[in-house]
Amino acid sequence: MCEVCVMVTSSQPRKQRKFRYEAPQHVRSNFINARLSEELSKKYGRTARVIVGDTVKVMRGDAAGTEGKVREIDVKREKVVVEGVSVARADGKEEARPIHPSNLMITKLVLDDPKRVASLERK
């Protein structure tokens, strides 16, 4: 088992930052959690892993209030790309604006995967 895989128990911020920075991909994927809407949280708990296809609402930032489907997830950078959230480039083209999952709220879950349903119901 790799040294980084063990969760850090220290309360020192520098060690927490170092853990997140040096974490391997399979551990980083656990950081891509977002809060669930009120009706979903009653059934599935407070948070859930964001996956492509989920419908989310942006809660903070310039795009606050925008609702759209998750188009892409960048596990390495811990960012989520949402349809309808973009920024204009200098040449006039629209480019997707990645958002940190802590600024999102999941409003509709994709429940096609039986393993995901089982993990949500365990909570």
UniProtKB/Swiss-Prot annotation:
GO terms for cellular component: large ribosomal subunit. The keyword Repeat does not apply. It holds the Pfam family Ribosomal_L26. InterPro entries: KOW, Rib_uL2_dom2, Ribosomal_uL24_CS, Ribosomal_uL24_euk/arc, Ribosomal_uL24_KOW, Translation_prot_SH3-like_sf. It comes from the Archaea. SUPFAM superfamilies: Translation proteins SH3-like domain. One of its GO terms (biological process) is translation. PROSITE patterns: RIBOSOMAL_L24. GO terms for molecular function: rRNA binding; structural constituent of ribosome. Keywords: Ribonucleoprotein, Ribosomal protein, RNA-binding, rRNA-binding. One of two assembly initiator proteins, it binds directly to the 5'-end of the 23S rRNA, where it nucleates assembly of the 50S subunit. Located at the polypeptide exit tunnel on the outside of the subunit. Part of the 50S ribosomal subunit. Belongs to the universal ribosomal protein uL24 family. This is Large ribosomal subunit protein uL24. It comes from Methanocella arvoryzae (strain DSM 22066 / NBRC 105507 / MRE50). The lineage of its organism: Archaea, Methanobacteriati, Methanobacteriota, Stenosarchaea group, Methanomicrobia.
